Amino acid sequence: MKRQALAAIIASMFALAACGGEPAAQTPAASAEAASSAAQTAAETPAGELPVIDAVTTHAPEVPPAIDRDYPAKVRVKMETVEKTMKMDDGVEYRYWTFDGDVPGRMIRVREGDTVEVEFSNNPSSTVPHNVDFHAATGQGGGAAATFTAPGRTSTFSFKALQPGLYIYHCAVAPVGMHIANGMYGLILVEPKEGLPKVDKEFYIVQGDFYTKGKKGAQGLQPFDMDKAIAEQPEYVVFNGHVGAIAGDNALKAKAGETVRMYVGNGGPNLVSSFHVIGEIFDKVYVEGGKLINENVQSTIVPAGGSAIVEFKVDIPGSYTLVDHSIFRAFNKGALGQLKVEGAENPEIMTQKLSDTAYAGNGAAPAASAPAASAPAASAPAKSDY
């Protein structure tokens, strides 16, 4: 069963069919409309008060549009915690605890200096209280006490986004690890006042480790296993909450020549991610989601409860595999994604296979040919795991 599950994962990575799920790009018209609306809001705001703006938030892998204003605002963010059963893998379901109905929660994008007002609701069907700790907030608990909310209740609090960067938010109700392990995390981007450089495509990706009673691939609804979580022995390590969430039909898409920016988080609760895109080198990495930029990076560490921003230009077409390069997590536990790039081949950068000839090894006489061994009932394609 485990081999069959792995086969399904890897097969999806190399499917050549066209993929959906591409985040919608903001058009110039939409950007101009948003800018005009924001300008009108600012003009109508009484002196000494911040204009009030409703946040545009997005489910992964989509990213909210860039901030298109040069002044601070009060940004209103609505969040709802929902406990729901969803697919973890083929034939496998899990009772997730979520922000806004999915894992990760919606991505939030604000500007340095904004006041973020959070309206936090806990769905009446929830079985326990929930809250949110914003790593972007300065103050005890990151808002956890202010947002502690029973089922069927709504709490409101605000914080000022003092420092730019990419930050995790997560539930912090005891037992904290259990709430996070069930999927309660997401990212908030605090753009610097001057904004970020423009790129062609942006994607939102968060890794998480999940602890089920049954082993990976065990069918049916799988409950949370606290003993495995304490021992840090996950059955699943995945991007965006589910096996195959950004692979196969859900693959990310770009075109050759485009610059891609990925906002990468790690909800944990336990494992550190070694994030890597097979066949690419990160031109820039905003280390741990902060101001420091590293260049020409092959893999970057994303700590549990942390983040990184990676940028790279895709020069040639192909299927680029996203992995946690603690590699058994990728090919055996689900930490696989896919970026499909269309465009013209460029043999100056890389060719296809040019030849395939016999080799006897160190000048020795060629060995007599032997009958071909039968292929094992394995899961990976014969030619490559990539």
UniProtKB/Swiss-Prot annotation:
Single GO MF annotation: nitrite reductase (NO-forming) activity
Location in the cell: Cell outer membrane
Lipidation (S-diacylglycerol cysteine): C19
Class of the enzyme per the UniProt entry, highest EC level: oxidoreductase
One GO CC term, this protein: cell outer membrane
Keywords annotated in UniProt: Cell outer membrane, Copper, Lipoprotein, Membrane, Metal-binding, Oxidoreductase, Palmitate, Repeat, Signal
Self-association and partners: Homotrimer.
The protein's name: Copper-containing nitrite reductase
Species this protein is from: Neisseria meningitidis serogroup A / serotype 4A (strain DSM 15465 / Z2491)
Classification of source organism: Bacteria, Pseudomonadati, Pseudomonadota, Betaproteobacteria, Neisseriales
